[in-house]
Amino acid sequence: MKRSKWRTRFAGAYCDPILRSWLTEPDSLTARCQRASSAFRVRLLRYGKGQALADEAVEGKAGRHSAWVREVVLECDGVPVIFAHTTLSTARRGRMTRWMAGLGSRSLGSLLFAYPGFKRGGIEFLRLDRCHPLYRRAAALGAGRKSLWARRSLHRLGGQQVLVTEVFLPAITLLK
């Protein structure tokens, strides 16, 4: 089995300190974005049935499998700062399936951190390059860098798991 490139420790020694603070934020990025801007918005890019990415494992399944896929961009004062990609296995139905379907342009983070039944796993980090599909999707939002930092974590509720990956766009460093 191929070893994951995602790491449980942040190894960005030469990372901008503001970016580092966002990457290692233990609480809700939605709440922090709301505090750091006067106008916060979640823009829904895509939601529907699709395939999990090769490096995503949800419900204990390695590699590509059928999943509900949701992609949004978090905007602060009209500027894209975070691209978020979420997968939920289609193998089981439950509260998460219904909630994800009904979110629309509302933040998933506000649900994950407000509902007491959620259990969050550890945060993993990866510097995405141009070969990674999430880099390409984030770059389409105007991120013209050779690489972008991302983090991901698994959230559990009952028998379901949702994998949330957040890709940090260059404008994030303009926020505190």
From Swiss-Prot:
Name its cellular compartments: Cytoplasm
What catalytic activity is recorded?
Answer: chorismate = 4-hydroxybenzoate + pyruvate
Chief location bin = cytoplasm
A single GO CC term for this protein reads: cytosol
Note the PANTHER family from the entry: CHORISMATE PYRUVATE-LYASE
Its family?
Belongs to the UbiC family.
In its UniProt entry, what is this protein called?
Probable chorismate pyruvate-lyase
- Gene designation: ubiC
